[in-house]
Amino acid sequence: MATIHVDGKEYEVNGADNLLEACLSLGLDIPYFCWHPALGSVGACRQCAVKQYQNAEDTRGRLVMSCMTPASDGTFISIDDEEAKQFRESVVEWLMTNHPHDCPVCEEGGNCHLQDMTVMTGHSFRRYRFTKRTHRNQDLGPFISHEMNRCIACYRCVRYYKDYADGTDLGVYGAHDNVYFGRPEDGTLESEFSGNLVEICPTGVFTDKTHSERYNRKWDMQFAPSICQQCSIGCNISPGERYGELRRIENRYNGTVNHYFLCDRGRFGYGYVNLKDRPRQPVQRRGDDFITLNAEQAMQGAADILRQSKKVIGIGSPRASVESNFALRELVGEENFYTGIAHGEQERLQLALKVLREGGIYTPALREIESYDAVLVLGEDVTQTGARVALAVRQAVKGKAREMAAAQKVADWQIAAILNIGQRAKHPLFVTNVDDTRLDDIAAWTYRAPVEDQARLGFAIAHALDNSAPAVDGIEPELQSKIDVIVQALAGAKKPLIISGTNAGSLEVIQAAANVAKALKGRGADVGITMIARSVNSMGLGIMGGGSLEEALTELETGRADAVVVLENDLHRHASAIRVNAALAKAPLVMVVDHQRTAIMENAHLVLSAASFAESDGTVINNEGRAQRFFQVYDPAYYDSKTVMLESWRWLHSLHSTLLSREVDWTQLDHVIDAVVAKIPELAGIKDAAPDATFRIRGQKLAREPHRYSGRTAMRANISVHEPRQPQDIDTMFTFSMEGNNQPTAHRSQVPFAWAPGWNSPQAWNKFQDEVGGKLRFGDPGVRLFETSENGLDYFTSVPARFQPQDGKWRIAPYYHLFGSDELSQRAPVFQSRMPQPYIKLNPADAAKLGVNAGTRVSFSYDGNTVTLPVEIAEGLTAGQVGLPMGMSGIAPVLAGAHLEDLKEAQQ
């Protein structure tokens, strides 16, 4: 710690910080542009000037840039010194000479760091009356709009995109006061994290194009704290709504998980919530048609049919909340509850959970991944299956440069010096996958092989680290030399990290990862292990347990069950569509509860219109076992009284109560959570994931809307001049209104939107943190459900045999895509242009055998259908395999590991 003196007052600060960071952490306001907590200091904008004095007696002082000055013990500075204030105002005036006076039409208006800093410096009058510099804007793809004339040359964008996210297609061109930030030519930004430019840019150069299509100001949107639903990582988000539509998603700061950044799937993939074809009212089949029901009719009709059924089974979902899955389990009984995922996937999920709970290895939070000094990724294409983890791995690899700089006593925030000292030095990263990955550019070595051979590599590494681990026979000398390099790197690391998961489709890959981690722990390393699952609540569903989807289908096929309730699950993604349809056709009652229109609704007798994550509350459990709560953003019935969309748990409990002819006793979310805790002790921690509905600050609920929210009384005037009452939230501590507490200093961790007096942009998160870039002042939201066990597991011993190609037979290797593999985000219209066209990848040798070239269309039979796809040649794919894009149209993820036997050139 260090003692500094600011304008005559004494403060205790972190001596490792610079003065800007230290003062902001104290709650003092210093304007800045080029500095960012995640990017460090370069001193480019000269905006953060303060007066520094030699000692208490010095009255003259000198101007210094606070972001480039260490917060040393005994430092004396003044923020309010007149010369410093005039200097800061003049810097803004210089920046404004070329900045357009277009705030009323700029999409950043009201959410703009430049506006905030201009007001903070007191610059309110323009003296410049000459021609402004102008630029041509670029088309940067479907996600981001480009308005280069607003640029103030702070360099944040390229520092984030190139230095932090390792993007290669955004740069700065020109010199002096005429520089251009963009691509060499028009085109879509290639980085999976390009959307963060929207929040990194302090002006309106980079803005959210998906928001532009249905634009409104930040102060006119309704927000709620939420969790990204697009993968298993559980990033914290702030969705904004207006007129019953999600308009944008912003990053919600969580110092333990995603801190400042999201991936593009999480930021832009929300379009499925706004689809017009979503089920909005319950419907029941009458012949070939469906008739619309109200809620009471739906409950009575379903109850009447279920009473006549001899056995009702429930099929849950990894994309439904803990509460919804539990409500289904209560409706049908624990013995009749099935997870809705394939047997193989369920086995892998249970194994991953076993490793996390009983393996004796620490599982780091997302932010902690950045602190590891050697990383082995086994079997996961992390950028496509858990993108935010990939960004964290990139920071971990860059830790080598920080380590080298620290040895020379260079401060952690001196990023230019760190990059200069590091000269692209990296901590070791080793990756295995069926083909190339997006982490190959920073990897020390990438092993491209079938999953069995990837697992064998992992087992061999574990054995080399610890002789008591099972040995692997038949390792080739060339591969053994690579194993020796990996072993040396992992054994020499202080904090090695092993990353694996369920997406490779192999139990042995997960077992190999666990063995490597155990072997490293035995050598005294501070080892961590991270498992990546497939869906937002895969881990929660795994903890809850239940039978596999195949077992559920068997119950229907044999007639042992004659009614089935399917919860938020397109079963065609998890099993053969022919088998699913045949099994559902045998059931006299098929009830579907979902917020999306899925293929199985064609077999449904009753459809209950569920609420999406934006219209409901619930709990999900991420890949590290962290329970996190998401909250309802808006009530769709407020805008259309005909809409009947309820949380799935509310539908299912209402049906359960109707069946038993009793009053509904889960009248609010807390009641469901209490029931979960009572029945499933391992989920007891979810109660602490967020405060209950009685939480108040000074007697007030928390506001979902900024206090400047406008137009509420006119919002429905085209429907009726009689203003309805605002929706009443009985489930949570939030209110659907601007009337409520939104103080940044209030004792809360669940923050719907970032705003503080004088800070309207995302930089307002500074005001919510215990120190800038650290944790939230009153703790990061969420709670871990299990910690590292004391004992650990024995070594896994089932080393697989080598992959052997078979003539006339090809094994399907899984290829995942950030844009296209996820069930929900692939429905977003804006994603259509970023999704690859379906393809089949072939090794050059296999392509030659078949007599086909790149672009040739080949066909194969699957599930009773003939599938025809264009060929793409993949040098890294081992012969005897074909690669298919998992999760895309007609290519269910359950196909991974299956075999094709009739692959041939398609008939023209």
From Swiss-Prot:
Keywords: 2Fe-2S, 4Fe-4S, Cell inner membrane, Cell membrane, Cytoplasm, Iron, Iron-sulfur, Membrane, Metal-binding, NAD, Quinone, Translocase, Ubiquinone. [4Fe-4S] cluster 1 binds at H99, C103, C106, C112. Residues 83-122 form the 4Fe-4S His(Cys)3-ligated-type domain. It catalyses: a quinone + NADH + 5 H(+)(in) = a quinol + NAD(+) + 4 H(+)(out). Its EC number is 7.1.1.-. GO terms for molecular function: 2 iron, 2 sulfur cluster binding; 4 iron, 4 sulfur cluster binding; metal ion binding; molybdopterin cofactor binding; NADH dehydrogenase (ubiquinone) activity; quinone binding. It is a peripheral membrane protein. [4Fe-4S] cluster 3 binds at C228, C231, C235, C263. [2Fe-2S] cluster binds at C34, C45, C48, C67. Its main location: cytoplasm. Its cofactor is [2Fe-2S] cluster; [4Fe-4S] cluster. It is found in: Cytoplasm; Cell inner membrane. It comes from the Bacteria. [4Fe-4S] cluster 2 binds at C151, C154, C157, C201. SMART domains: Molybdop_Fe4S4, NADH-G_4Fe-4S_3. One of its GO terms (biological process) is ATP synthesis coupled electron transport. Residues 221-277 form the 4Fe-4S Mo/W bis-MGD-type domain. GO terms for cellular component: cytoplasm; membrane; NADH dehydrogenase complex; plasma membrane; respiratory chain complex I. Composed of 13 different subunits. Subunits NuoCD, E, F, and G constitute the peripheral sector of the complex. NDH-1 shuttles electrons from NADH, via FMN and iron-sulfur (Fe-S) centers, to quinones in the respiratory chain. The immediate electron acceptor for the enzyme in this species is believed to be ubiquinone. Couples the redox reaction to proton translocation (for every two electrons transferred, four hydrogen ions are translocated across the cytoplasmic membrane), and thus conserves the redox energy in a proton gradient. Belongs to the complex I 75 kDa subunit family. This is NADH-quinone oxidoreductase subunit G. It comes from Escherichia coli (strain K12).
